Amino acid sequence: MTDTIGAGQPGQDAFPPVEELSYEQARDELIETVKILELGQMGLDESLKYWERGEALAKACEAHLDGASKRVEEALRKNAEGTDSAAHNEEAGED
């Protein structure tokens, strides 16, 4: 068995690189990985490979969510600045 998890190399154990997965793809694969691990029907080495893959997928999901959160915060900040600026202009009689 070759170690190709996350390498995107062809083979029975190959998974696409985590960095190339969208949030939804990583989340769905993580769910499937957890289901596979919960079955407990693999040997130790294979279980560890799936566990390591699951950890990488969880980190990728967290990174996607952190990025989305920052984008929302930035958009809200810009919106608040625009609202404050428009209100200030109205108070000053500038339309």
Swiss-Prot record:
It is found in: Cytoplasm. It comes from the Bacteria. Pfam families: Exonuc_VII_S. GO terms for biological process: DNA catabolic process. One of its GO terms (cellular component) is exodeoxyribonuclease VII complex. Its main location: cytoplasm. Signal peptide: none annotated. One of its GO terms (molecular function) is exodeoxyribonuclease VII activity. Its EC number is 3.1.11.6. It catalyses: Exonucleolytic cleavage in either 5'- to 3'- or 3'- to 5'-direction to yield nucleoside 5'-phosphates. InterPro entries: Exonuc_VII_S (IPR003761), Exonuc_VII_ssu_sf (IPR037004). Coiled coil: none annotated. It is an enzyme of class 3 (hydrolase). Heterooligomer composed of large and small subunits. NCBIfam families: PRK00977.1-3 (NF002139), xseB (TIGR01280). Bidirectionally degrades single-stranded DNA into large acid-insoluble oligonucleotides, which are then degraded further into small acid-soluble oligonucleotides. This is Exodeoxyribonuclease 7 small subunit. It comes from Corynebacterium aurimucosum (strain ATCC 700975 / DSM 44827 / CIP 107346 / CN-1) (Corynebacterium nigricans).
